[in-house]
Amino acid sequence: KCYAEAEAGKYIEKSLKAIEERYNEIIKGLGLKLSLKEQFETIKKNFEALAGKDYAASRGEYLNGIIMANYLGYEFIDAATVICFDKDGEFDSEKTNEVCEAKFANIERAVVPGFYGAMPNGKVKTFSRGGSDVTGSIVARALKADMYENWTDVSGFLAADPRIVNNAKPINVITYKELRELSYMGASVLHESAIFPVRKGGIPINIKNTNAPEDKGTMIVETTCNMPEYTITGIAGKKGFVAISIDKDMMNSEIGFCRKVLSVFEDNGISIEHMPSGIDTMTVFVHQDEFVEKEQKVLAQIHKAVNPDSVELEANLALIAVVGRG
C-alpha cells in the first residue's frame, strides 16, 4: 500500500509512520534497545525515488532480519551485499558463492534476510515464491556446512498432499532428484531451486518444524541405501492441463513426424509438459492457460505440418507424478 501510494505520487508519511510504529511495538515487546529510525528514513527516500516493487517487497524481510540479529546478538548481513543477480536479473550462482565465502570467512554467527539480493547497479531484486529457501541454501553452500536445516511449519514432506489424502505418511529420507520431481509437480514444502546450491556442495537438507522441533522431519540427500517402506516415495500433481491427441495411420514409419508437431508448439511459445505416444498416436500435454488463446492457430498448423487422420482435445486435466525407488 505504502509503495503504491508513492507510485501514485501521494503522501506516504502517514502510512510509513504506522508501519514504523508497529515495528517499534515489536522491538519494545522483545525488550531490545534498538532504533530503526535511520532505516525508515532510507526506505522513505527510496520509495519516493521509486526504487522498485522488489525493493518494497523485501523491506519487511530486511527489517525483520535486523531485529532478529539484534535479539540473538548476531551480526546482520544485508542480503543485497552477498546475493548477486546479473544485469538481466538472473541469479548469479558463482559470483554469489565467491562473495559469500569471502564475507563469511571471519564471521561465526550471522542473520541474513531471505528472498532478495541485488543486481550489479545495486537495484534490489527478489527471488520467486519461496526464495528464502534458496537464500539459506546458498549460504549453506558458501559456508561448506555439514547440513542445511530448513525450518518451516510442517514436519517435513508427506507422501501425498494431506488436503487430498487423509493420514498421508511422512517421508523420512528423500533424494535430491526425487524432491525435484515432487516439487515441480506441486509439492511445496521447499522451493525446488533451493536444491541446486547444496547439491553442488554435497550438503544434506533437513526439513524441520518450528512448532514441533522434536519431530525428526525429512532428510534430503544426494543418494541413499535407505529404502522406503513402499516402493513409492511420494505422489504429487498439478491441475490445468490440456491433452492434444494426434492420430495417423503408419505414424511410426513417417520420418520427422514428432519433430514437426513439436515445432508447431515451439513456434507458438507453448511449453510441452508430457508426451506419451503409441504406434499411430501421440499425445501432447500442455498448460491450458498457455494453449487456450492459440488453440485454433495451433490445430491448423498441426494439420498443415503432418496431415493427421484426427486431432482430439481433452481439457481440465491433472498430471500425477509417482516418484520412488526400487
Set out the residue ranges of the language-model regions.
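Short hydrophobic alpha-helical runs that function as membrane-insertion/retention elements
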Residues: 147-151, 205-207, 273
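Acidic/polar loop patches that form or flank catalytic/metal-binding clefts of enzymes
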Residues: 191, 202-209
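Terminal amphipathic helices with adjacent charged low-complexity linkers/tails
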Residues: 1-4, 158, 207-224, 286
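A conserved regulatory-domain signal marking ACT and ACT-like small-molecule sensing domains
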Residues: 216-326
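Nucleotide/pyrophosphate-binding catalytic subdomain
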Residues: 1-190, 195, 287
